[in-house]
Amino acid sequence: MSLSLGDIKFPDNWDLIPNEKNYIDYVYKESIELEVWRPNNKRDLMAHNNVVSLAKYFWPHVDFNRLVMGGELMVWFFSFDDVLDAGIYTDEKQMDLVKRMDNVFINGTVESDATGPEKMALHLRKKCEVMCGKRRKDTFNRFISSCVQWVDSIIPFNKLRSAQGTSPHLELYSYLRKVNIGAYPCVTLTEVMLDHEIEYYIWSDPKWIKMNEDIAIITTLINDLVSYEKEVNDQAGDLNPLYFLQNQKNIPLPDSYKQVVDLIDFWVKDYQTMEQSLLNEMEFKDSKQRSDMEFILEHLRYLASGSKKWSMQTPRYCSPTSPFIEMRTKPSTPVMNSTKKQKIDHVPSQSFISTPIDLNN
């Protein structure tokens, strides 16, 4: 049976060329120093290279320092989430870890026995606080709030399985997963990276909020598709819609896949409608403000299209037996990150941000 991710269609202006990959080693050294990863551990190194490479797809138009921040966010995401997903801690211990991580972001402090993910979180928080300064305190607060929101979503989402006993309805799953997927911290980190002059009211505009939700759901569904084989093999398919739709509706895999693709197409169209409506209502005071907004919108869309591109090359999900032809690899052949860049017609409105980060201020 062969399915194709080519059935997922995005508008041309969602296409991207991944950023450079030289930041990956830099973030790895940081992660060793912060005790996220173990020195000279091949498994940790492989995990690092897989997950941190996602940043170059999410932020293709930022400079090295900001790309490093994206890599740090990925390290924090995966290392903290994996701890809670592993099933090695009691409910009480998991709640304690969540409370400790919330404290890192809210108060900017860590315990004396801080874990690696907690140290990485504090490290990134300090960078964001410096970059935002006093003038953009609201931006910093949005980033902090989105990170706390994500941390607080992990246990409730994991409880979907045990609380229900069976797979959840797709609507309930999507509602919780759009927070749990981690898209919002990526969006707010993009705002941190950009020294923008966008009007404050935009961030509370219902259209902007709905656009964020649309992209989060699209990204969720893409992640669920590409992780299908891995999750089924790990006995975790009951929280994957590609799997549980087969069981709930008694349909074969191709039909389940078509339903998910149709959902993605629906949310892409909804996003486009919302984006156009938002832009039609906005009155830009100058070209800088217009360029800032275009940059934010580009990188919001890249969360969806970047997820798809990254998934088709990462060893985290690619395998010889993948149901998706684009993700099949030869047995025992590692999938390497491609450095060959594709030609695209869309030229980003703002190719690079290159303002230095001064951590001494």
From Swiss-Prot:
Enzyme Commission code(s) on record: 4.2.3.160
User: Which terms does the record give in the GO molecular function aspect?
Assistant: (2S,3R,6S,9S)-(-)-protoillud-7-ene synthase activity; metal ion binding; sesquiterpene synthase activity; terpene synthase activity
User: Is Hydrolase a UniProt keyword of this protein?
Assistant: no
Tell me where on the tree of life, at the top rank, the source sits: Eukaryota
What UniProt keywords are attached to this protein's entry? Lyase, Metal-binding
Alphabetical list of Pfam families matching this protein = Terpene_syn_C_2
Q: Which GO terms describe its biological process?
A: sesquiterpene biosynthetic process
Q: Where is this motif: NDxxSxxxD/E motif?
A: 223-231
Q: What induces it?
A: Expression is detectable but at low levels in vegetatively growing cells and increases during development induced by starvation. Expression is highest during he ultimate stage of mature fruiting body (approximately 24 hours after induction).
Q: PANTHER family from the entry?
A: TERPENE SYNTHASE, TERPENE SYNTHASE 2-RELATED
Q: Domain remarks in the entry?
A: Contains several highly conserved motifs that are important for catalytic activity including the aspartate-rich 'DDxx(x)D/E' motif and the 'NDxxSxxxD/E' motif, both of which are involved in complexing metal ions to coordinate the binding of the isoprenyl diphosphate substrate in the active site.
- Give a short account of what the protein does: Terpene synthase that converts its substrate farnesyl diphosphate (FPP) into the sesquiterpene (2S,3R,6S,9S)-(-)-protoillud-7-ene.
Tell me the protein's name: Terpene synthase 6
What phylogenetic lineage does the species belong to? Eukaryota, Amoebozoa, Evosea, Eumycetozoa, Dictyostelia
